[in-house]
A protein has these predicted regions:
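Non-heme di-metal
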Residues: 1-258
């Protein structure tokens, strides 16, 4: 929310981009945040202690500081490009291991956390859109910077290298988070190895969207075989009417089913 509203809308003062940034910011604070807050309410975690706990967790606190440091600069075209490129990867890769972990409870015959799965689908669809929009901003600005001669070939190479290095840092961060998920042992139906390779695939997608080549190319990625199915497919809302998207389903219609 803060990045779209306070960075993108100020750095890109075009009305159409500002409308996009405002819409994305609203989705984060007006749709996703209430959903996750509702989960916390059901779990009894909607309290100040829980919402500030990340500050006392060295791993999570360092990640938040790293993100803030990497995307805050706006003094040059180069730094704006780097910021938007990194943020596009953050939107398209960070949290996806958590998305996959939660979604697996509703796959492969488990059929648990139905409401949570629906909300995660909304988040994954929106985060993917936000990532792709950020990548479009990056490519457009880079093309214009090249045409206007405000970025050199050497800077273009450096930019690519910095963004590729960032994917490796993101993977390291995600690996630590994934390790926390399995601190108390293995979980039937999903593994840390599967989640790591899924994050690698997400980072490759982000690089491709930015106009760069893949660097991870995981050959073992079973999560992808089921993760995207209910994100991309239509569902039958009414046998006698038509098909539509589950995105229109309201998770507040009923109680959470575990």
């Amino acid at each position: 929310n803060d990045y779209w509203q306070n960075y993108v809308s100020k750095v890109f003062p075009r009305p159409d981009i500002q409308r996009m940034a405002t819409t994305f910011a609203f989705m984060e604070i007006g749709v996703h945040a209430p959903f996750y807050n509702r989960i916390n309410e059901v779990l009894g975690l909607d309290n100040d202690e829980f919402y500030t706990a990340y500050m006392d967790d060295e791993v999570l606190n360092n990640r938040m500081k790293w993100i803030s440091k990497r995307v805050s600069k706006r003094d040059t075209v180069y730094n704006i490009l780097k910021s938007v490129g990194i943020f596009s990867m953050i939107e398209g890769a960070i949290l996806y291991s958590s998305f996959a972990f939660l979604k697996h409870f509703n796959n492969n015959g488990k059929n648990k956390l139905v409401n949570v799965n629906a909300g995660i689908n909304f988040s994954a669809i929106d985060e993917t859109l936000h990532s792709e929009a950020g990548a479009w901003l990056f490519r457009t600005l880079l093309d214009e910077a090249i045409q206007d001669g405000v970025i050199t070939e050497a800077e273009q190479v450096k930019l690519r290298q910095e963004l590729e290095d960032t994917t490796r840092i993101i993977l390291e961060h995600e690996a630590v988070i994934i390790g926390k998920i399995f601190e108390k042992g293995s979980i039937k139906g999903i593994s840390d190895k599967q989640l790591i390779h899924f994050v690698e695939s997400r980072l490759d997608i982000c690089l491709s969207n930015l106009g760069y080549k893949h660097i991870f190319n995981p050959t073992y990625n079973p999560i992808a075989s089921w993760f995207y199915k209910d994100l991309e497919s239509s569902t039958l809302h009414d046998f006698f009417s038509s098909q539509g998207s589950d995105y229109n389903r309201a998770w507040t219609e009923g109680k959470f089913a575990w």
